[in-house]
């Protein structure tokens, strides 16, 4: 058991212990892993077979707005919301996914307005869950990402893809840098008690995936 008598030394020791206790995935890098990376037509074929989770950061937002104290997640006036460009972006990504014939299964969203709207515009539905946010409200003071890691490590229903629309910070916390851009998706493959990143798809990449299918 750690015992501390000097406040500054105690704080430093506790910080070190917290780093050691952090999820292993967060100590790495969320770029596609060598030996697992997929792109182009090979990525499309893999996604059509199901078995992956696509973790999206919400699409483009209006940064003149800010998250403030709120009484409930449906209180959109106190949150940063999608911009018109972000709404168009979400619709376009959803259309590309349908055009590629990808088997969309469950759609899970952080309960914030921007993430729920992203899911609904992409897929026509979204089930709110704080698991993909990692904590309640706007403060990460009590963040617990263990359930998010467990979700990402679990396979979706057979033959389907699990779609998540959430935020950049939770993904960085469990997978490491680089940070997801707005509208960017990480493609994750379950790997025992964790997961591996096999691809990252930026909003503008979907057209290239469709083109790779036509050229195969």
What is the predicted role of each segment?
Residues 1-6:
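N-terminal secretory signal peptides that target proteins for export/translocation
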Residues 11-21:
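Bacterial N-terminal signal peptides
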Residues 22-26:
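Sec/Tat signal peptide C-region and signal peptidase I cleavage site
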Residues 28-130, 135-139, 177-196, 200-216:
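Active-site-proximal alpha-helix that buttresses catalytic centers in soluble enzyme cores
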Residues 51-53, 160-166:
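Generic beta-sheet signal
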Residues 132-139, 145-153:
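All-alpha RGS (Regulator of G-protein Signaling) helical domain and cognate RGS-like helical scaffolds
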Residues 154-160, 190-193:
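A short, structured loop/turn motif at beta-sheet edges
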């Amino acid at each position: 058991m750690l015992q501390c008598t000097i406040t500054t030394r105690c704080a430093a020791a506790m910080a070190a212990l917290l780093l050691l206790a952090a999820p292993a995935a967060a100590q790495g890098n969320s770029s596609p892993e060598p030996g697992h990376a997929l792109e182009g037509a090979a990525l499309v074929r893999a996604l059509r077979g199901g078995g992956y989770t696509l973790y999206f950061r919400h699409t483009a937002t209006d940064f003149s707005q800010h998250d403030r104290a709120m009484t409930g997640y449906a209180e959109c006036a106190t949150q940063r919301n999608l911009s018109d460009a972000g709404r168009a972006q979400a619709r376009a990504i959803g259309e590309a996914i349908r055009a590629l014939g990808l088997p969309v299964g469950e759609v899970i969203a952080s309960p914030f307005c921007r993430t729920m709207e992203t899911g609904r515009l992409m897929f026509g539905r979204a089930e709110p869950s704080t698991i993909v946010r990692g904590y309640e409200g706007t403060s990460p003071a009590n963040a617990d990402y263990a359930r998010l890691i467990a979700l990402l490590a679990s396979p979706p229903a057979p033959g389907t893809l699990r779609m998540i629309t959430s935020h950049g910070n939770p993904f960085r916390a469990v997978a490491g840098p680089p940070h997801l851009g707005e509208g960017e998706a990480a493609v994750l493959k379950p790997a025992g008690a964790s997961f591996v990143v096999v691809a990252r798809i930026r909003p503008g990449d979907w057209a290239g995936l469709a083109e790779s299918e036509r050229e195969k």
